[in-house]
Amino acid sequence: MYRQIYVAVAALAGLAACTPPADSPTPGQPAGAAAAAVACQPAPQMAVAGRASPYDSAVVTLGGAQAKVCYGRPSARGRTVFGGEGAVVALDTLWRTGANEPTILHLPFRAQLAGLALEPGSYSIYTVPHANQWTVVVNRSTSQWGHERSYTPEIRAQEVGRVTVPAGRTAEFVETFTIRAQPRGANAADLLLEWENTQVRIPMTRRA
């Protein structure tokens, strides 16, 4: 019960954090210190009200500046999350890393994400879950709808790169997909992707 209350409160707080002021630049535009502040504008294809998977955000603080990850949060609801036929997310296939919109990283500084060098700006983050490791896909395109069918050859051509990270297990069952940051010093952190009993760590460091 307490976990359900926590998820509901977090979703409401995330929705407020994901709504930019009226004069904010659109996603894909920021390239400086304001990137985190303008993050998380929901795509127009689906109204936020009534979504089964709430729109939320995670903040990553590196070197005193904040990046923000914006994503939809689906829940297991008694279903098998990662697996074969009938699972919410099929193994070995491209996934938007959440629900509805693709997951978006808004970055106000130069960084490395799992070894990929990134300049300030906005990027969509897809993943390909495998049994023991995940492929992380970073793309410069952020305006497409998140469904994997929308990942056309034209959008794939805008990829920054693909990297592989190991997949582990969570200490307890995670009902609702969660992205959070775990600091590793002043200029480094791990982005943790957690759902069901799976945990994936994506290392992130700030570059000079």
Model-assigned labels for residue ranges:
Residues 1-16:
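Sec-dependent bacterial lipoprotein signal peptides
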Residues 92-148:
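Mid-length scaffold segments of soluble, non-membrane domains
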Residues 189-196:
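Short, exposed beta-strand-loop hairpins at the edges of beta-sheets
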Residues 18-21:
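Bacterial signal peptide processing site
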Residues 143-188:
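Surface-exposed, gly/pro-biased binding rims or lids
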Residues 34-102, 106, 110-113:
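N-terminal secretory signal peptides
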Residues 72-74, 110, 128-132, 141-143, ...:
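Solvent-exposed coil/turn segments that connect beta secondary-structure elements
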